[in-house]
Amino acid sequence: VLLLARANDNYDRSLGWQAHSLEVISQTRSLDAALARAEAALGRFAVGLQKEDGRVYEQQWGLSQQYLTLLQRNVRDNPKQAALVKKLTDELGRRGEQLGDAALSANYRQTVAAISKYNAAGHDAALIRIDRLLSDLIRNERTILAERNRVAASDRANLNQAILLFSLLGAAAAIIAIAA
């Protein structure tokens, strides 16, 4: 019974780690999407000076920061991933200042300055670094997930063996009881 319980616990733990990896991948993609929506809204705000676009920019940028916080929390047990998230946090801090300058100009209806700052931000090398960091996070987590899938399959096989052994022992005990 203890063998069966331990095999079941190992399998449950493996499934939990798989779910954790999928969550990290999902949060990374959600962060990327929120950043893209924020930058698109800022572009519209810089050109059209519509306050609603400015609000969408602020909301999406804030959402991206929430995803970043979740990501920091979820990778803290993995030094390699935590280091990537730290670099990403630093890059996004600088990016936020850059985009904030463009948003401020748009807020004060300085169209030329807003467009110019937004355009400069669009050509900044930080975009490539941020994209690379996001891709690295996902690639690393997929590697971790593949290993976790292998462990889960092994744990599932161990659980099946324990169930089979437990069933055979139960059948043998029943036969002995009937024969006696």
Model-assigned labels for residue ranges:
Residues 49-51:
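Short loop-to-helix capping motifs
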Residues 5-11, 45, 102, 171, ...:
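Transmembrane helix-loop junctions and nearby membrane-interface residues
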